[in-house]
């Protein structure tokens, strides 16, 4: 096992404490070990992934897309409109839901999305990340840190459980994506308590229609 590899939350925390690094920094170094590539190249590729996520959110919120079958489309725009009108769940949560729906509709319309960790759950992570970015003024550097952190959480799930809906149902996909997104949002405050007993959570893959399971397990950040 190399210096920055981990398969559980406990191992991840131990590395963070030993090296004095954040989760995103550990994940970046892990990726360097796995890919034998430079941090600069890894971040460049990850930035391409980030921009693909952003484009899918923007496309779904500004265009009334329709699925190939015609059964769905336009819900993201309607939900986003309602988010500004005293939504029961609160404006921020409603905006995140709308942004997540936007990506799902781009996927259904055969657009370009990022499987995070799968195409079926592709909206959750970007929906949360970009909504929080708009609320908190996060720049690309902060968002890249978020993707690395989410990838670290995802790699734990991939190592211990499954991100496959066909194998374990929709919760394997959406539950994993939600854990990646939520833990990224609160990781600074409660990292130790949230991760100490964590033994499962998925991987970010490059822009594609479907995540490649085996590649994601071996290389949880960019496949």
Give the positions of each predicted feature.
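Intrinsic low-complexity, disordered N-terminal segments enriched in polar/charged/small residues
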Residues: 192-199, 208-211, 220
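Conserved phosphate/anionic-ligand binding catalytic regions in large, soluble enzymes, centered on
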Residues: 110-128, 173-177
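Generic N-terminal targeting/processing segments that precede catalytic cores or assembly contacts
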Residues: 1-111, 135
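Active-site-adjacent structural elements in folded domains
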Residues: 110-113, 163-169
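Beta-strand segments within the central parallel beta-sheet cores of soluble alpha/beta enzyme folds
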Residues: 139-152, 190, 196, 203
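Acidic-glycine-rich active-site phosphate/pyrophosphate-binding loop
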Residues: 90-107, 142-162
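A structural signal for small-residue-enriched, beta-sheet-centric alpha/beta enzyme cores
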Residues: 165-173, 177-178, 182-186, 196, ...
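Alpha-helical support elements that line or immediately flank enzyme active sites
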Residues: 126-138, 182, 186-187
């Amino acid at each position: 096992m190399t210096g920055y590899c981990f398969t559980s939350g406990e191992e991840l925390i131990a590395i963070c404490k030993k090296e004095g690094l954040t989760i995103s920094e550990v994940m970046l170094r892990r990726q360097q070990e796995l890919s034998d590539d430079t941090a600069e190249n890894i971040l460049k590729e990850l930035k391409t992934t980030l921009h693909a996520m952003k484009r899918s959110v923007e496309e779904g919120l500004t265009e009334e897309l329709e699925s190939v079958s015609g059964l769905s489309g336009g819900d993201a725009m309607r939900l986003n409109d309602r988010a500004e009108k005293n939504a029961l769940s609160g404006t921020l949560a409603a905006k995140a839901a709308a942004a997540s729906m936007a990506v799902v509709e781009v996927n259904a319309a055969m657009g370009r999305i990022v499987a995070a960790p799968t195409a079926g759950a592709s909206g959750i992570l970007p929906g949360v990340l970009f909504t929080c970015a708009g609320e908190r003024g996060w720049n690309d550097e902060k968002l890249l840190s978020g993707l690395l952190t989410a990838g670290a959480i995802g790699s734990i799930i991939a190592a211990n459980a499954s991100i496959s809906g066909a194998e374990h149902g929709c919760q394997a996909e959406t539950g994993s994506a939600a854990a990646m997104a939520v833990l990224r949002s609160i990781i600074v405050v409660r990292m130790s308590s949230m991760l100490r007993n964590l033994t499962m959570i998925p991987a970010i893959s490059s822009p594609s229609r479907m995540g490649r399971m085996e590649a994601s397990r071996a290389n949880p950040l960019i496949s």
